[in-house]
């Protein structure tokens, strides 16, 4: 008789893996990367550690998966904006709105990876894990490059004016990512409330960059 695990369909295995990633994001957000344990993740799932270890060999591996998913949320949110045929100042603001919304909508992921790469770089990691960390840093840099490209295009177009695109990009990402440090989910908060927060933040940032 085959084990039940062997009978699982590919999509069921994917769902199980995704559930672990989501539970880990919650644990990392609440307890921090260094204090959260596999036991904590299993508790959130209401399962045993065995289920977690079936998909991930270590807590580091889970963190890497959380980080990849967090960044994918960002790419998915901003991608459609990049296709819009609008002035680059408007595009930059729309990108900022999309980023701010994804920070709020996927808060456990985004807060759990805040400075996470730097924490792991300071810690004890294997050569293979350091290679993954480099990959994650490159992924983050690729995302930030999307904003620098729009900033450069906006300056060339004349709709944006900044002394340094490099510094403007860092200031912008710092302000947007910093949202996870002060934003708190409230039961009475509506989707429109989140839109307003995202729009106000984006306009505050980009407003100082328009020509």
Where are these regions (language model features)?
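C-terminal peripheral helix-coil segments that are non-catalytic and often amphipathic
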Residues: 1-7, 98-102, 141-156, 173-211
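Helix-turn-helix
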Residues: 2, 8, 19, 23, ...
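Alpha-helical structural segments
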Residues: 15-26, 30, 44, 61-84, ...
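Helix-turn-helix/winged-helix DNA-binding modules
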Residues: 30-33, 54, 83, 152, ...
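Amphipathic alpha-helical packing segments from all-alpha helical-bundle domains
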Residues: 72-75, 123-156, 167-170, 196
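Secondary-structure edge/capping motif, primarily at the C-terminal ends of alpha-helices
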Residues: 81, 85, 117-124, 183-187
């Amino acid at each position: 008789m085959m084990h039940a695990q062997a009978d699982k369909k590919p999509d069921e295995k994917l769902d199980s893996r995704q559930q672990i990633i989501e539970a880990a994001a919650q644990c990392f957000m609440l307890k921090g990367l260094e204090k959260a344990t596999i036991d904590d993740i299993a508790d959130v799932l209401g399962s045993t550690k065995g289920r977690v270890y079936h998909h991930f060999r270590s807590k580091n591996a889970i963190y890497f998966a959380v980080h990849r998913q967090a960044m994918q949320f960002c790419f998915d949110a901003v991608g459609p904006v990049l296709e819009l045929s609008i002035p680059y100042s408007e595009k930059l603001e729309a990108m900022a709105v999309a980023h701010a919304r994804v920070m709020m909508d996927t808060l456990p992921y985004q807060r759990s990876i805040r400075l996470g790469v730097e924490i792991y770089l300071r810690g004890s990691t294997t050569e293979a894990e350091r290679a993954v960390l480099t990959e994650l840093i490159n992924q983050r840099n690729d995302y930030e490059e999307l904003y620098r490209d729009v900033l450069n295009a906006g300056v060339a177009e004349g709709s944006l004016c900044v002394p340094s695109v490099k510094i403007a990009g860092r200031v912008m990402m710092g302000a947007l990512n910093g949202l996870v440090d002060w934003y708190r989910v409230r039961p009475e908060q509506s989707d429109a409330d989140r839109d307003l927060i995202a729009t106000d933040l984006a306009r505050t940032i980009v407003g100082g960059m328009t020509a």
